[in-house]
């Protein structure tokens, strides 16, 4: 199953302030992305391309622990349940919120100090059953983690906080354990596109933000659908298949072009769309297209 997630709004600047964006204080989300992008860079891997460079005086090993703690303190009350049998199969019996914070913090610190990010597929096989259970809870994985056949990306993301996970193979999805998610912005979204997105969505209700994320993800789903000569649906390529494609990774793709395509679609099907929905959709895609231009995409 592919889950859809929307990154929390980080930058809150108005458009006239767009050139000052990198001078703004970092949110917990931005900080964890900056820290773990620096960690991955030490091991020859790409983190968030939109992350600000890590330039703090705090040693990175300490920043690994503190950035996770800050992120957890901000998001744990809304993202995690700590009641066994509450409907979440990943909840650990007799474990508290503080247990999860401390346990995963130690897992992250150990992974950094022991070089686990160099070969995550091998490293996760050294983790104990208890450590894997903590990771399962952090990442909301439905089933216990099997380390035998994980891809490099799926293993790596077990060792990264949720908002620092990366789409390593650029297939448009983020794999963690056996789970896939589509998120936008993701680790490969350029900084100017992320700024345009956040300027466009900062005042939207979360439900509408998720709707817009799903509309962007729909492009990948459609690109992987196959039809016969009569236009009948035959099958869909699955993540990992040789014929799986990510349109956003193709030469010539632009988000402004995608926004233009959505506006063309709305014009073509205007008579079939409820007027209030049509107005909202046109307003969103026109705003996103304009902001992309303002931020230089």
List the predicted regions and their residue ranges:
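Type III/flagellar secretion export determinants
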Residues: 1-297
């Amino acid at each position: 199953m592919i889950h859809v997630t929307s990154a929390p709004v980080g930058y809150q600047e108005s458009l006239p302030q767009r050139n000052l964006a990198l001078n703004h204080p970092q949110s917990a989300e931005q900080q964890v992305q900056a820290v773990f992008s620096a960690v991955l860079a030490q091991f020859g891997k790409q983190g968030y391309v939109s992350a600000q460079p890590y330039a703090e005086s705090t040693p990175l090993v300490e920043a690994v622990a503190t950035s996770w703690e800050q992120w957890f303190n901000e998001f744990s009350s809304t993202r995690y349940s700590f009641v066994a049998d509450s409907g979440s199969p990943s909840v650990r019996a007799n474990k508290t919120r503080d247990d999860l914070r401390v346990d995963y913090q130690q897992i992250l610190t150990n992974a950094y100090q022991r070089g686990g990010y160099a070969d995550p597929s091998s490293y996760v096989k050294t983790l104990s059953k208890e450590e894997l259970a903590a990771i399962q809870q952090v990442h909301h994985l439905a089933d216990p983690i099997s380390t035998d056949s994980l891809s490099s990306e799926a293993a790596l993301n077990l060792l990264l906080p949720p908002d620092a996970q990366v789409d390593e193979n650029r297939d448009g999805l983020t794999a963690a354990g056996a789970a896939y998610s589509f998120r936008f912005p993701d680790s490969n979204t350029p900084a100017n596109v992320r700024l345009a997105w956040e300027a466009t969505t900062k005042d939207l209700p979360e439900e509408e933000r998720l709707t817009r994320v799903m509309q962007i993800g729909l492009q990948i789903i459609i690109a992987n659908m196959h039809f016969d000569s009569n236009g009948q649906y035959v099958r869909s390529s699955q993540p990992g298949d040789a014929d799986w494609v990510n349109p956003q990774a193709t030469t010539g793709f632009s988000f402004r072009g995608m926004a233009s395509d959505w506006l063309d679609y709305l014009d073509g099907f205007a008579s079939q769309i409820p007027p209030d929905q049509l107005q909202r959709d046109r307003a969103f895609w026109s705003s996103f297209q304009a902001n992309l231009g303002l931020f230089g995409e």
